[in-house]
Design a protein with these regions (language model features):
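A short acidic, Gly/Pro-enriched loop at the edge of an enzyme's catalytic core
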Residues: 113-123
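A short beta-strand submotif of the Rossmann-like class I SAM-dependent methyltransferase core
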Residues: 125-128
Length: 231
């Protein structure tokens, strides 16, 4: 199932987690946070915000209806956010409201060819790589790296079957029947910190940490593009 064609259609409705910064979550966000074992507000404030400056240029993969996008834009008041998605997200994200600070790219593959080289300080995704097999993930990391500045940071949530085993499949809302099926037939393909780290290294990134420890069910990796660190 985690083929590019499947991903293009499965989330075409635009995934929406609500306002990730509100102190009181919506019902949808509450259910997601219960499944993942984390607070989205804490994920943003501790996992992403420390890497954002007012003038940062950020690349976001798979924004959906913009839950994380709006949080990012609230921090990069003099910077830019470029989003990449298989669907046209402009109706949901409304880039015209941001005076050129938000650029939405609709793409057909994982080449990142629509984006300029050596342009971004931060590469972010949440709820995206968990639905990609490790081969797709490595392709994404390889091709996106050319768009990043030297020393740029990447932060990505991804599925971690080792943590999922400890957390509980039912609690994590992932069908335990997936254990017996190949990755091609499931929407939560096999991954863990070792596989993810290997894919990132193969793609040319340096690993800051394979997991920042903010999620109970999944992991969040922090990578650095070789060069002078940007903090």
């Amino acid at each position: 199932m985690p083929t590019i064609d499947w991903l293009k259609t499965e989330f075409s409705y635009g995934y929406d987690s609500g306002n990730v910064l509100s102190r009181i979550p919506s019902l949808t966000r509450y259910r997601e946070e219960k499944a993942i074992g984390a607070s989205y507000r804490r994920v943003f404030l501790q996992g992403l915000a420390p890497y954002l400056k007012p003038n940062s240029r950020v690349l976001e993969l798979g924004p959906g209806r913009g839950s994380w996008s709006r949080a990012i834009l609230s921090r990069i008041t003099k910077g830019e956010l470029h989003t990449v998605d298989y669907v046209d997200v402009r109706e949901w994200l409304e880039p015209s409201k941001y005076s050129g600070r938000l650029v939405c790219h609709q793409v057909t593959d994982n080449s990142f060819s629509e984006l300029p080289d050596n342009s971004f300080d931060v590469f972010w995704s949440f709820g995206v790589l968990c639905h990609n097999n490790i081969e797709n993930i490595e392709t994404i990391l390889v091709n996106a790296r050319s768009t990043m500045k030297a020393g740029a940071i990447a932060i990505h949530q991804y599925g971690d079957w080792s943590k999922l085993d400890r957390y509980g499949w039912e609690k994590g809302r992932v069908p335990e029947a997936f254990r017996e099926k190949p990755d091609a037939d499931i929407w939560w393909p096999r991954n863990n910190q070792e596989k993810m780290s290997r894919a990132a290294i193969n793609a040319g990134w340096e690993i800051e940490t394979p997991d920042i420890g903010l999620l109970a069910r999944d992991s969040m990796i922090v990578l650095r593009n070789p060069g002078t660190k940007v903090l």
